[in-house]
Amino acid sequence: MELLCCEVDTIGRAHLDRNLITDRVLQTMLKAEETSCPSMSYFKCVQKEILPNMRKIVATWMLEVCEEQKCEEEVFPLAMNYLDRFLSVEPLRKSWLQLLGATCMFLASKMKETIPLTAEKLCIYTDNSIRPDELLIMELRVLNKLKWDLASVTPHDFIEHFLNKMPLTEDTKQIIRKHAQTFVALCATDVNFISNPPSMIAAGSVAAAVQGLNLGNADSVFSTQRLTLFLSQVIKCDPDCLRACQEQIESLLESSLRQAQQQHNASSDTKNMVDEVDISCTPTDVRDVNI
């Protein structure tokens, strides 16, 4: 008798439960997000050593870890929510900021992943600057300060509600979903979006995705003005505030792309310099080549 291994790397996923994208659930989420928003003023009122640029650095590192580990899209924004909420109530030494970031990813992966990140793996990503026992101690500290309230509402929770209300094909929805998720992750790295409620970030991300994909003209339901008005009615906010959030997201995307292009050009220049050195060291005579 032959034994066949049928194990696969892909994780099985349940179909979307339509009961979870009803208006009743949406209204409950809009009420719940008010209690899970961190304070924007914690840099001035709570933290003595932590600066906005430090948050940017650790957030970028956390995003890279989540991408390399192929975490669920919700893990990174949820981890940043934990980080900001903790920093809103507890002063922290700057030397412990990476430990806090690793701990928040540890907790978020437990909430959203089928196979969560391990403490040992996260310590490796810090070049072993922290130990697993330190991470576990910090985990209890974070849980205590967050009062064990880990079911935070994030922008990802709203995206499916918005797409469900839009007359689109499934393929188009999937493209918008991926673009909006990218915008949400980008917003989580920027300190200027801390004060924005998750519903507004999600609506602004969806609107920016539709605009970037050129899905509508001036007369269609997906025109900038009509879509902004529609989404603002769904989340019960001022259309001008939502439009400002969308423009802020688009501006952040442009600056991020510009920065990435500059880094790419700098790395290309460095590579060209190395190549020139290699060329100058190449023997001009075949007899000089050491096989």
Swiss-Prot record:
Keywords: Cell cycle, Cell division, Cyclin, Cytoplasm, Nucleus, Phosphoprotein, Transcription, Transcription regulation, Ubl conjugation. GO terms for biological process: cell division; DNA damage response; G1/S transition of mitotic cell cycle; mitotic G1 DNA damage checkpoint signaling; negative regulation of transcription by RNA polymerase II; positive regulation of G1/S transition of mitotic cell cycle; positive regulation of G2/M transition of mitotic cell cycle. GO terms for molecular function: cyclin-dependent protein serine/threonine kinase regulator activity; transcription corepressor activity. Signal peptide: none annotated. It holds the Pfam family Cyclin_C. The modification Phosphothreonine is found at residue 282. Its main location: nucleus. PROSITE patterns: CYCLINS. Phosphorylation at Thr-282 by MAP kinases is required for ubiquitination and degradation by the DCX(AMBRA1) complex. Ubiquitinated by the DCX(AMBRA1) complex during the transition from G1 to S cell phase, leading to its degradation. The DCX(AMBRA1) complex represents the major regulator of CCND1 stability during the G1/S transition. It is found in: Nucleus; Cytoplasm. CDD domains: CYCLIN_CCND1_rpt1 (cd20573), CYCLIN_CCND1_rpt2 (cd20576). One of its GO terms (cellular component) is transcription repressor complex. It comes from the Eukaryota. Regulatory component of the cyclin D1-CDK4 (DC) complex that phosphorylates and inhibits members of the retinoblastoma (RB) protein family including RB1 and regulates the cell-cycle during G(1)/S transition. Phosphorylation of RB1 allows dissociation of the transcription factor E2F from the RB/E2F complex and the subsequent transcription of E2F target genes which are responsible for the progression through the G(1) phase. Hypophosphorylates RB1 in early G(1) phase. Cyclin D-CDK4 complexes are major integrators of various mitogenenic and antimitogenic signals. Belongs to the cyclin family. Cyclin D subfamily. Interacts with the cdk4 and cdk6 protein kinases to form a serine/threonine kinase holoenzyme complex. The cyclin subunit imparts substrate specificity to the complex. This is G1/S-specific cyclin-D1. It comes from Xenopus laevis (African clawed frog). The gene is ccnd1.
